[in-house]
From Swiss-Prot:
This is Protein FAM83G. All members of the FAM83 family of proteins share a conserved N-terminal DUF1669 (domain of unknown function 1669) domain of about 300 amino acids. This domain mediates the interaction with casein kinase 1 (CK1) isoforms. Therefore, it has been proposed to rename DUF1669 the polypeptide anchor of CK1 domain. It comes from the Eukaryota. It comes from Mus musculus (Mouse). Residues 79-90, 761-772 have a biased composition (Basic and acidic residues). The modification N-acetylalanine is found at residue 2.
Length: 812
């Protein structure tokens, strides 16, 4: 029904009277009676009603002629899509002749069920059209409303209205909805077809049903193909209908003209998509955006719901061509801004990188060359977005001469309290396993931070010394000793192998039977085979008797003193007891490339280790509570040794030398610095080993300013160790000699706080030993000195006189 008729059914219009002079005047019962007379009896009856009701002549001659031509008999069956689209004229009788013509025109046969004539049908006779190609989501707020007005012909240098419309079509990405009374412009229609076929944009078109035939003629001129129909929907609609009491009706035309794009823009006005409207007619359009676009959204959905489909099957179309390959241009990375470039090269990112940028680029390029087919090796044009080569961003000009910040100063490190002069250890970084809820100190690893400046200088001096030495001997001859038995310092690697080679780790297990079978107290260093014997003085001629401190952290060779009484009286250059041995047989778990010097089978050059090994600090627990103390022997007689420099970005996780802030070690309580220096230089007096048997610890007297029980001295990383003359027969099953080790080693007491290095014995003692601290002492046993003594005295590995020795060392 017409809108005026719908308003009459509203409760607000009951007894509502309005005159023609008021703005709200819309519906008039007198005008309705005049239209009823026009439709039923013609124009003369129309003018008679106007005179009788004394109302204005509200229809023009053009409108009278259009209404008379548009009158049709209201027949519910004619609206069925299965019936021919021929519209019956008012002059037709609508009887049997009309039904026969309908059947002849291809209508439904008599046996087929006709549309229902029920007033409230259970099911609709027609399906509701759906926006099957997609529609933008409903947005609560679309933004601020903005409007731009364009005229035809353009004024003030504005683009013409056709250009504005075509640009909006080319910029569409989601949906284009067009409502037009007359659509015959081929250029705009081709733009819509390309948007739907090439860019997959949904295109909906609604045209006036009286102008559908002109639209179909345009489709024939556009040379469409079948691919254009995939994302195109065309429907037709008309104006509102006016129903009369004589079972007739007439309908208006679709005069709305707007285009709705992507749910956020719309263009409307008097412009129709025709050539004449863009060239000769004067029109105006408005381009709108913002919240006002919501009205166009709702209006199009309502029109689409009441519209009828337009079939394009009768239009001759070509086959769908193959889609053209989309060649994307190679995107050159833009130079980042100065602020962003500084963020990208921030040194703090080096702490979380697993590899350096050069290694990542090299590995990725090698992988691409391997996976690429042989025919495509070398530079090739990328045809797909995934084939684009990843180029490293260029260095920003602002970063060329920019000094990098040292972010290690901001790390949560624990610097050693009062470090010794010349120590290269700056601090430690905790590494805690996130899977452990409450980590203990023995479950933490640490990264030792060292100063590599001195190591670089030592490396340069070694290069200069290597270039100046003409002798290619594998090892230098034994250096002469001075009067005190101290070997002069000598920096550098052995001359035989100037290029460091990657060491090959080998098992350290040695058959015990072969060790027990050997007899003799004069057996010294066994490097290659058990059959080879060393000289009587206990020095291997292939190795130097002593080594300088610079050689120790790089070569990891163990020094040896002559097995004579005088040698025991000499001061140990590195502050080691004879019982203590260095850490050269430990391998850092996180860095497989760092191996110690004794991991190989021979005395040749090994690759220097850049990782810190397990600490050799140990203590003797007495009855009175003695706090844990850290012993330092990094300061050696010949100067501090430094490991070679390594990249900060390389993965390197090692285990530190003390338990961290949880264990709270105190620094040098009960022993002054002068006492430590004196104990490193002063030698140990020999003891009668044959009378008391072989023991695991050397109990000697040291000259100390502080009275108290004797203490064990630690062995630091990369230091030398002296030999001890012992008989394998006297040691019994506790004596073993690893392959490649320069001296026979003694199995430590299970009760000793020092961690054992024999993997086989470690497996046997795992059931009885608790989790040890980084010093090797269980935290639960630190205060139980009696129990610890009992274990040390009554252990199955302890000799028979161990208890007597423990009693000898009690405080008086």
């Amino acid at each position: 029904m017409a809108f005026s008729q719908v308003q009459c059914l509203d409760d607000n219009h009951v007894n509502w009277r309005s005159s023609e002079s008021k703005p709200e005047f819309f519906y008039s019962e007198e005008q309705r009676l005049a239209l009823e007379a026009l439709v039923a009896r013609g124009r003369d009856a129309f003018y008679e009603v106007l005179k009788r009701e004394n109302i204005r002549d509200f229809l023009s001659e053009l409108e009278l002629s259009r209404i008379v031509e548009a009158i049709e008999v209201y027949d519910p069956g004619s609206e069925d899509p299965r019936v021919s689209g021929r519209r019956p004229e008012p002059q037709d009788n609508g009887g049997a002749d009309a039904s026969e013509e309908t059947s002849a025109a291809g209508g439904p046969p008599a046996t087929e069920t006709l549309p229902s004539l029920e007033y409230w049908p259970q099911k609709s006779d027609r399906s509701i059209p759906q926006l099957d190609l997609g529609w933008p989501d409903t947005i609560a707020y679309r933004g601020v409303t903005r409007a731009s007005v364009y005229m035809q012909p353009p004024i003030d240098g504005q683009p013409h209205i056709k250009e504005v419309v075509r640009k909006m079509v080319s910029q569409a990405q989601k949906v284009i909805a067009v409502v037009m009374d007359m659509f015959t412009d081929v250029d705009i229609f081709k733009d819509l077809l390309d948007a739907g076929f090439k860019r997959k944009v949904a295109v909906y078109i609604i045209v006036d049903e009286s102008n559908v035939k002109y639209f179909l003629h345009m489709c024939e001129r556009a040379r469409m193909h079948l691919g254009h129909l995939k994302n195109l929907r065309v429907r037709s609609s008309g104006g509102t209908e006016f129903f009369t009491r004589s079972a007739t009706k007439f309908k208006g035309v679709l005069a709305q003209k707007f285009m709705f794009v992507d749910g956020d823009r719309a263009v409307c006005g008097s412009y129709s998509f025709t050539w004449s409207a863009a060239r000769t007619d004067r029109n105006v359009i408005s381009v709108l955006s913002g919240q006002v676009v919501e009205m166009f959204d709702r209006q199009f959905q309502e029109l689409y719901l009441m519209s009828q489909s337009v079939s394009l099957k009768d239009i001759p179309m070509e086959k769908e061509p193959e889609p053209e390959p989309i060649v994307l241009p190679s995107v050159v990375p833009l130079v980042p801004t100065g602020t962003m470039a500084k963020k990208l090269v921030n040194p703090k990112y080096a702490l979380v990188k697993a590899k350096s940028v050069d290694e990542i680029a090299k590995s990725s390029s090698d992988k691409q060359e391997v996976t690429r087919p042989p025919g495509l090796r070398g530079p090739a044009v990328a045809e797909r977005p995934g084939d684009l080569s990843e180029l490293l961003p260029p260095v920003h000009p602002g970063l060329l001469n920019l000094e990098r910040a040292n972010m290690f100063e901001y790390l949560p490190t624990w610097v050693e309290p009062d470090p010794e002069p010349g120590s290269d250890i700056l601090g430690y970084i905790n590494i805690i396993d996130p899977n452990i809820w409450n980590p203990q100190p023995n479950q933490m690893n640490r990264i030792k931070i060292r100063d590599t400046a001195h190591a670089s200088a030592q490396h340069q001096l070694w290069k200069q010394s290597q270039g100046a030495r003409p002798c290619p001997a594998p090892c230098p001859p034994p250096a002469p000793r001075d009067s005190q038995g101290v070997v002069p310092a000598e920096n550098g690697f052995p001359q035989g192998n100037p290029e460091p080679q990657a060491p090959v780790p080998k098992p350290r297990t040695v058959p015990v039977a072969s060790v027990l079978a050997r007899d003799g107290s004069d057996i010294g260093w066994a490097l290659d085979t058990p059959e080879k014997e060393t000289p009587q003085n206990g020095i291997d001629p292939r190795l130097p008797s002593t080594a300088s401190e610079s050689e120790v952290p790089q070569q990891q060779h163990s020094s040896m003193t002559q097995d004579d009484p005088d040698g025991l009286e000499r001061g140990l250059p590195n502050g080691l007891d004879e019982d203590e041995d260095d850490d050269d047989d430990y391998v850092t778990l996180s860095d497989q490339d760092s191996l110690s010097g004794s991991s190989g089978p021979g005395p040749g050059h090994r690759r220097p280790s850049v990782a810190s090994s397990m600490s050799d600090e140990y203590f003797e627990v007495r009855e009175r509570s003695v706090p844990l103390q850290r012993r330092h022997s990094e300061q050696m007689a010949n100067g501090p040794g430094h490991p070679p420099r390594r990249q900060l970005s390389a993965p390197h996780v090692t285990r530190g030398t003390f338990g961290g802030p949880l264990s709270s070690p105190l620094w040098a309580q009960g022993r002054s610095r002068e006492d430590v220096d004196a104990s490193r230089i002063q030698g140990q007096r020999p003891m009668d080993r044959q009378a008391q048997g072989q023991h695991f610890h050397r109990h000697g007297s040291t000259t100390s300013r502080t009275p108290g029980p004797p203490r064990f001295r630690p062995a630091a990383d990369g230091t030398q160790s002296s030999s001890k003359k012992a008989s394998p027969a006297a040691a019994g099953p506790h004596h073993w000699q690893p392959k490649g080790s320069p001296t026979p080693r003694m199995l430590p007491d299970p009760g000793s706080p020092r961690p054992t290095r024999n993997t086989r014995l470690r497996a046997e003692l795992r059931a009885t030993e608790e989790h040890a601290s980084p010093f090797g002492i269980p935290y639960s046993k630190l205060s139980q000195s009696k129990h610890l003594k009992a274990r040390a005295g009554g252990s199955q590995w302890a000799p028979s006189d161990s208890k007597r020795r423990a009693r000898d060392h009690k405080e008086p």
